[in-house]
Curated annotation (Swiss-Prot):
The gene is ureF. GO terms for molecular function: nickel cation binding. Keywords: Chaperone, Cytoplasm, Nickel insertion. GO terms for cellular component: cytoplasm. It is found in: Cytoplasm. This is Urease accessory protein UreF. UreD, UreF and UreG form a complex that acts as a GTP-hydrolysis-dependent molecular chaperone, activating the urease apoprotein by helping to assemble the nickel containing metallocenter of UreC. The UreE protein probably delivers the nickel. It holds the Pfam family UreF. Required for maturation of urease via the functional incorporation of the urease nickel metallocenter. Transmembrane segments: none annotated. It comes from the Bacteria. Belongs to the UreF family.
């Protein structure tokens, strides 16, 4: 096996590790408003689950998280920590409810704690960024993927998968869905990733951001939902 092949294999393994549901950052604790949507019967089966997640991907994740992930990578490439911090602040400001902001920051904080303890990744050059008082999960994901020498497309694709996997896992418990239905959703939603990356990477700075009022309201109302499995 050639060195290039070994490098390619290692990078794939690192990507799989970063996107694993076993990554101890608490993603399983948050439904991102989906729990309230199920409570209100906005989501009741495989079709409506697909529509809910696909809308969030195309109108929010691609136009905010993925677009800013590109800016974060550009900032890391040029060692422009000021630009990185501004992009991070932009991400946090785009969270449309207290719960969505809390979920993003809580996962970011857990990821920072993990990253600093990983022996195989030297995060010291980015200690200034990692010691910021508030870091979005997306920002820490960007640093981790960059340290693993993943290219932007791999990082963005992996981030998409992380979101899709988390949402489908939450829907499987909440709707509920069967395991085969969940696998069909994973296939169908992951087929959208190329299109999502195209949208994200064509956006100009002033075009970044998208509002989903129903998601924001579901997340806000979830705070007072009578019974809950998830923290958001």
């Amino acid at each position: 096996m050639t060195a290039d092949k070994q490098s390619s294999t290692l990078k794939l393994n690192r990507l799989l590790q970063l996107c694993s549901a076993n990554l101890p950052v608490g993603g399983f604790s948050f439904s991102q408003g989906l729990e309230y949507a199920v409570e209100m019967n906005w989501i009741s089966g495989q079709k409506s689950t697909f529509e809910w997640i696909e809308l969030n991907l195309s109108e929010s994740l691609s136009r905010t998280d993925l677009a800013i992930l590109k800016r974060l990578y550009q900032a890391l490439d040029s060692s422009d920590f000021t630009a990185f911090k501004l992009a991070n602040q932009h991400l946090i400001a785009c969270r449309e409810s207290s719960e969505l902001r809390f979920a993003d920051l809580a996962m970011g904080k857990a990821f920072v704690r993990l990253l600093k303890q990983l022996d195989s990744l030297d995060s010291e050059p980015y200690s200034e960024l990692l010691n910021e008082p508030e870091l979005s999960f997306v920002s820490v994901f960007a640093i981790s993927a960059y340290l693993c020498e993943l290219d932007l497309t791999a990082a963005q694709s992996g981030f998409c998968w992380t979101y899709i996997d988390n949402q489908v896992a939450a829907a499987t418990k909440l709707v509920p869905l069967g395991q085969t239905q969940a696998q069909n959703l994973l296939f169908d939603l992951s087929a959208e990733v190329d299109h999502l990356l195209t949208i994200a990477n064509q956006l100009k700075d002033h075009e970044i951001g998208g509002s989903l009022p129903r998601l924001a309201m579901a997340s806000a109302w979830h705070e007072t939902q009578y019974t809950r499995l998830f923290r958001s």
